[in-house]
Amino acid sequence: MTEQTENATRLARPLIRLAKLVGVATSYVGMSHDYHEIEDDVLVAVLGALGIDASNDEAINQSITSIKSERETRVVAPTVLHVVGKESKVEVHGGMFDVPEASITLENGKQFTGKISHEGGEKIAHEINGSFFFTSYLVLPADLPEGYHTLEVTVGSETETATVISAPEKIELLDDMKNGSLWGWMSQLYSIRSKGSWGVGDFEDLKTMLVEAKKKTGSDFMLINPMHAAEPVPPLTPSPYLPISRRFINFSYIRPESMPEYLTLSHEDRAEVDALHEQVELLNDDARLIDRDAMWRVKKHALWVIYKAGRTKARQAEFDRYLAECGDEIESYATWCLCYDKWGAPSDDADNWVRKYNRDSEEVAQLREKFPDTLEFYRWLEWVATDQLHAAQQAARKAGMKIGIVADMAVGVHPAGSDVWWNPERFAKGATVGAPPDMFNQQGQDWSQPPLNPIALEQTGFRVYRDMVHGMFANAGAVRIDHILGLFRLWWIPEGKPATDGTYVHYDSDVMLGILALEASRAGGVVVGEDLGVVPAYVSKSLSEHGILGCAVEWFEQMDGVFRTPKDWRPYALASVNTHDMPPAAGYLEYGHVKLREQLGLLSGPVEEFQKSATAEHNAMLNMLVEEGYLDKAALDDEAANENEIVDALYRGLKGSPCKLMAASIVDAVGEKRTQNQPGTNNEYSNWRIPLADGEGNVVPLEKLFDEPRLQEITAIMRG
C-alpha cells in the first residue's frame, strides 16, 4: 500500500515546517488517490511568491522566527470573523498583567454599545527579544450586528485595529427552494444574438432572454458566463475567465441604442450611430466564429458619439453617485484603460508601460492630465455597463423570475490587467493558478492567472474580495463561484514550471465564506460553488454548513464506472447535464470530446484507451437511463436516429433529482454539438467564440430561440 503521509524525518525539516506554518502544502492526494510529496524547489519558489525567503537554510530559519514573532507579539490579528448570534473569541497578546481595552466602530460610523468582555488564556509565556507575551481573549457578544466593523484594541501602550467581519452563520434558502426546487437555463451570452445585436450578444439581449425565458418556459434563472471586465481596445481576450478585473464589468456588452442618451441624439449623431451598427449587423447571422474585435471597433466609435453628446442633469447626477460609490477603485480601472488606449497593449517587454510604470509614476499622472476626456469616457462606459446589467436583472425580477441572473465569478484575473497593475501587493509574484492532473486534463492546467496573496488578504480585511462579491450581488440574484475550492486552497504553479509541478496554498476559507454569507443574505441571494474534481470532505462539509450549494453534473455523478441514480444526488446542488468545458449533450453522445482531444494532442496515452474508457462511460450512462425508466431500451438499437430521445432522457434524469436548482443548457435545447471551451488549450482551439447554432450549423437568433420546438420539448421535461 502506498504511503499516504509524510514521515517524521521529512516533517522535522525546516523547509517543511516553514511551508506548513504559512499554509503551503508539502504533499497532496490526487483524484486517483495517488500520493505526492512536493519537491523542495517548488516549495522554495511558492514561498518566494508569498514574499517569504526560503532561499537557504539560514533564510528559512530566519523566516520561521520572524513569522512566529509577528504572530505572538501583535495585539490583534488584522481580520476577525464573528458569527452573528454567537459569541466570538478574539485572541489578543500582551504582558501578563495587561488588561485589553476594546471598542468597536460599526460600519455606519456609530459606536457599538454592547459589552465586550475579557477572558484569560493559557499562562504560557512567549519570549520574543527579551520580552514575555501572553495570550488572552476578547469576547465579542452575540448581539454584534452584521457588517464590516472596526475593532480597536489597546494593550499597555500598544493600540492596533482589526476589521471585524460579522456575518450570518449560513445563507438561507429562498422560500421556493426550501420545500422544492427551481429550474433555469445556462448560456454563453456573447453567443446569442438578435437583430439588434452588434455581432455579439449584449445586455439588451440578456434582458430579452430573461423576460422571454420566464414568459415562454416558466424558468426562474439564467446562468451566464462571467461579466468581468475585458480590454478597452481590440484585441479582446475571448475567455471570460481571464478578465482584466473582477471588480468591474465588461463594457463591450453595452447596447448603445438602449441608452436614454441615444434617444436624445441629434439627427446627425443618431444617423452616425445607426450607420455604424449596420457595419456589423450581418455578423448576427454568421455561423462562423464570434468576432468580438470587429464588434468593439465599431461599437466603441458609436459610444464615443453618444458620450460626446452629453447627458441630462438627472443622468449626470446618477453618474456622479456611481463614481462616489466606486471610490478609488474606478480611478484605478479607468487609468489602466487610458494607459492601454494611449500606450498600447501590455506585454512582457521590460520597456512596456505595464512593467515600466506604476500607479504613482509621474508619466501616468501626466497622461491623466493630458487626456481627461478619455479618462472620463472609461469611467462613463463602466457606469453605463453597470446600469444596463442592473436593468436586465430588474426586468427578470419584474417578469416573475425568483432569481434572475446567476452571475459567474472567475477564479482570477489577467496578470497584466488593471487589478494586478494598480495593486500588485494584493497578488503573489512569480506564480500562477491552475489545477493538478486529473482524468479530464491529464497534463494539469495552468490558467495563467496570478493568485491573490492570502497574507495580503488578511492584512487588508479581505477588502478586495468583499468589494468584488458585493458588486456581483448588486446585479444578480445568485452568484456561482468558479472553482470554489479556491476559497480553501489553490494550486500554485511557480513561474517556468509545468502545471504538474505545483502545490496547494491554503486560504482563510472561514472568512471568505463568511463574506459570501453576509453579501448573499443582504441581497436575498443564493451562492453556488463549483466543486467538481478533487474536493476534500472538509470542503464539502464547510460549504454545506454555510448554506452554499454545490454542483452536480450528470456525466460526473459516477463511482468506479457506475452512475448514481439521479434520485440519489445530493439535494443542495445546482444540477446540470453538462458544463461549458464539455461538448453539448448531442456532441458528447457522438464522442466529440474524444475526437477533439485526439485532434489537439491532449491525450497522454493512446487514443484507443481513451475511446475505450469513453465508450464504457457512454454505455453505463445509457444503461442507467434505461434501468431508471428515463429511456426506452429500443432507442439503443439506433442511437443516431434516436439522438433527441436520448438527450431527453438525460434531462428526465436531471429532473428526477432532488437538487434545489436545475439548469438546462441552451445549446442542448437547440441541438448544438460544438464544444464551447476545451481546457488545456489557448489558440489551438476556438474557445469562447462559438455562436449559438443548431445541429446543422444554422444560427439560432434570439427572436426564434424560445419558440424552437426542441427547446420547448426540453422545457416540457423541466417543467414536469
Feature roles, as predicted:
Residues 48-110, 114-115, 122-148, 153, ...:
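Acidic/aromatic-lined carbohydrate-recognition and catalytic surfaces
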